[in-house]
Structure formats: structure tokens, C-alpha cells
């Protein structure tokens, strides 16, 4: 796997709030995409640009058991 960009605050917020714009999981929040789908992108190639970076970061977060981080961010967004 290529070097994953270090998620910044805006990336983490986008992972929690942005929906997949196309494909099998169109309309699904990025944070809710199954690992198998993200792994498929890892094998086939992530989309270029911000979406690809977000998907790659989402996979890394899930693979490293850091999903609680996304839960906390989501709670903070809802609380505002």
C-alpha cells in the first residue's frame, strides 16, 4: 500500500460526514463503508484526489482499530 496521507481535522470530519458519491455504496457515509469495499479499492486503485485520500485514510483507521476516533468526532459534530 502507498503512503497514506496523515489525516488532518478536516479529513476526519469529511470521513464522518461525506457520503460515497458513486458505486455499490453510493449514498453511504465514508465511515460506514465496509472494510472489504475499501480493500477492493486498495487492490484496484483509489480514486484520484481528495476522495481517494479520504477512502485510503478510512481504510487505515479501520484496519488499525481507530474507529472510536470517528465516533468521538461524530459526537462532537452533533453536539454543536
Across the structure, where does each feature detected by a protein language model lie?
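DEDD superfamily 3′-5′ metal-dependent exonuclease/proofreading module
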Residues: 1-80
Amino acid at each position: 500500500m502507498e503512503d497514506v496521507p496523515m489525516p488532518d481535522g478536516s479529513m476526519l470530519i469529511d470521513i464522518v460526514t461525506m457520503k460515497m458519491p458513486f458505486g455499490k455504496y453510493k449514498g453511504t457515509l465514508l465511515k460506514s463503508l465496509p472494510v472489504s469495499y475499501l480493500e477492493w479499492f486498495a487492490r484496484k486503485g483509489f480514486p484520484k484526489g481528495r476522495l481517494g485520500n479520504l477512502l485510503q485514510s478510512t481504510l487505515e483507521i479501520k484496519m488499525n482499530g481507530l474507529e472510536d476516533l470517528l465516533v468521538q468526532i461524530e459526537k462532537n459534530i452533533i453536539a454543536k
